[in-house]
Every structure is written in C-alpha cells, then in structure tokens.
Amino acid sequence: MSPLTRRRLVGLAAFGGLGVLAGCSTSDPLQSSAPAPGTAAPGTTAAGGGTLVVGSQQYYSNEIIAELYAQAIEGAGYTVERQYQIGQREVYLPELEAATIDVLPEYSGNLLQYYDKAATATDPAGVTAALETALPAGLRVLAAAEASDQDSYTVTKAFADEHGLTAIGDLTKAPQPVRLAANSEFAIRPYGPEGAKATYGVDIELVPVEDSGGPLTARALKDGTVQVADLYTADPTIAKEGFVILEDPEGLILPQNVIPIVSEKVDATAAAAIEAVNAKLTVAELQALNARSVDEQARSADIAKDWLSQQGLA
C-alpha cells in the first residue's frame, strides 16, 4: 500500500463515527473517468519537462479542473502523474505539504480558513492576499480564476415558499433543528452547524452524505430527507431542479474562487500553463464544463481536451 493510499484511508476513517447516507450511484458524473496515473490524456503527449503529480478532491468538478491543469502542463512538455478523487483537505493537504502532490485546484476561502481559522478577509482579493502568508513553507498559490464554486445553504423552492426563506437566517422560521445534507467534514467547517448557530441563530442537524454535493445530496434534498443541502454553486443541478440558494448577508461562507495550490517543483513554465487555464475559467465556463459531466456523463479527460482546444490552449 502506497503512503498516499495509507494516508487517504486514515483521513477518511476520521469521519467514520458519523452516520452516513451514501452509496454507489450510477449517476456519479465522473466514476473512473480519469486517465490512469502516469498516463497522458487522449490527444496529449508528455515529455521533457520533468514529472509533476496533479491531484484532485473527491468531487467531479474539481477533477475536471485538475484535468485542465494536467493537460495544459503536458502541453508545456511535462510528464504528469494523476492522483484524482483523493478526498477532502484533511487528506490531501498533508500530501501537498509532503510534496507527494505538486498541483491541486483549490477554493480560496475554504483553503484560507483551513490554515487560518481566525482569518478576517471577506472579499476575493483579500482572501487571495491572506493566503500568501497563511500557507506553510513549500506551498504557494497561483493566480485565482474568476470562476468560483462555493458551498451553499440550498433549499427546494417549495420549502422556501412555505417558510418565506430568502437568506440563511430565515431558516429560523422553519422547525428546528433543520436537517442539512453535506459531507461529514461539514460538521467542523467554519460555515457548518456552529457557524450557522453563531451567525444566524439556526440549529442544524447534519445528515452526512459523502458525495461532495453530488447526486445523492441533491436527491436527499429533493425527496425531503433533508430540508437544506450544501450544494456547490457551479452545479447545474441547482438550476435544473429549481433549487434556491439562500443569501448569506453576514458572509458566513467566504468567496471560493478556483485557485491552484502548488509545490516548489512547479516552475515558471508549468505555472504559466496553469495560469493560462485560470485566465479563461469564468463562472459560466465552469458551469458549462460541469454540465457536460452531469448531463452527458462525459469523461473529465474528454471535457478538458475539448475545452482547451476551444480556448486556444491546446
């Protein structure tokens, strides 16, 4: 068993004590969609610039972004090893710190709060600036994309209409506690149950659903298993199902712009290739990429290859 696999299992086991609503789903957008680790994606070659390991969270959209970076790096002459669907921050950030992974797409606000729980920055530029001093030695972030994909407190339109909900604080109008579907680590996030109670006076009962805001989480919301779900804002399911994202006037959830976190092995040439991707990655573009995965069940490698070609980056 490799060190990465061993650490991954330990990290996942840390949340094993919570009851979990999870299981296999045929609608998992990216199940086994990535090229094998150490192989180039279709239509790309890898040679000449050394080897970089690109990782992704256990989240289909994050894998798509990771594959964009991977293919862009390969196009710049590097060999890429892929380590996708690793897990959440408690698992993969130690791997980055140990230089087992060299590149991983992150989300600015959540990354900042992982390293600095007392962070006070609330706007995108301030969050990015704060990250530059919050990260441990050996890690740095590159330029953030315009695209963001934020955690959210999302409800069905029927539930919003029934209780007159437009903002997170309005959840106090509904019977307490409110059941919320999210990954189990939501329990310890600053915007989780404790944050919702302290900021808005809302009592949250977490129902763990381990698919990172994916189809199981959406299904739990739609069928009434829960009243609220942590769906990510670039998910096309929100618009398709007519779900309502509750406003967050107090800034409980920080801006979550897509931002690459990289090791010291990422040189100027590789960094430029990654930043060229981020320069083109808008909110609309990310939503379109995600829609191809959800609606077409397209592989991350194919989605990335097509998009890079369309953007003149291939």
Kindly label every feature range from the protein language model:
Residues 124-180, 279-283:
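A conserved helix-loop-strand patch within extracytoplasmic ligand-binding domains
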Residues 1-16:
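N-terminal secretory signal peptides and thylakoid transit peptides that target proteins
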Residues 20-23:
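C-terminal motif of bacterial Sec signal peptides marking the signal peptidase cleavage site
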Residues 177-248:
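Ligand-binding pocket segment of bilobal, Venus flytrap-like solute-binding proteins
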